[in-house]
């Protein structure tokens, strides 16, 4: 594979209040400790580290109906959106280290401020498209897409802390891969809006190669545009990423996950990346934590050109002997 260096802006989003399980705020630290930045630099990437966001406690963050921590989630996402927009204005690919998946609201909103024509590939066991009125858990990490879709604008009530969010995606701008745990209301939304998805049924039937071909044809067929990849590590089977909050059996294999990211790299269009829901507290053993973190790191590296076939710099390695 040919070698092209890229400039990346990394921002940690150590946030956990979009869901009930502590520990996911440790995700960014775990990914950094695993040498992610050094490995990207080895790949000749120009890496600028924007550090980790600090999230102040929001007092009196009472539920909105059953939606939990709405002001905390809203404020954290506003902070993240501002930094992602800055990274994009500087011409870098944004890399968000989560943190729970509610932070995709800020990541994609900030990205869309600078590249309003972006499209989204969402790799996840779940659609995360419940609205504040359809959610059965009240956890905002199961709702980010509903806040981002223009077609759902009229279905979203005024949630305290989230009134700043302006929907920036149309239903035709997103493709899901890896779905296998979809609520009835979410399935209704997918079908009613005609959202393109490849559940594990389609992955099994078509194979991951055809899935990626069809996803690119659907999103990029008419016009090449920036890709935002939002990757929840629970998209992979829990064998590969056990340390995560909502694991679902029968997921993507390690190889399928890496293939997705390799193919996105090859388009040359990756403009924003989220790697979400790594929760070091939820590994049953230290090895499970290491396995999850190392898998997440490998997914990120493949997005930036680390290829299983190998690669090389554009130099002549076969100079004749002197």
UniProtKB/Swiss-Prot annotation:
Its EC number is 3.5.3.1. Belongs to the arginase family. Mn(2+) 1 binds at residues 101, 124, 128, 232. Keywords: Arginine metabolism, Cytoplasm, Hydrolase, Manganese, Metal-binding, Phosphoprotein, Urea cycle. It is found in: Cytoplasm. This is Arginase-1. Disulfide bonds: none annotated. CDD domains: Arginase-like. The modification N6-succinyllysine is found at residues 17, 75. Gene3D superfamilies: Ureohydrolase domain (3.40.800.10). GO terms for cellular component: cytoplasm; cytosol. It comes from Sus scrofa (Pig). Substrate binds at residues 126-130, 137-139, 183, 246, 277. GO terms for molecular function: arginase activity; manganese ion binding. Homotrimer. Interacts with CMTM6. Residues 1-27 are annotated as: Disordered. The modification Phosphoserine is found at residues 7, 72, 163, 217. It is an enzyme of class 3 (hydrolase).
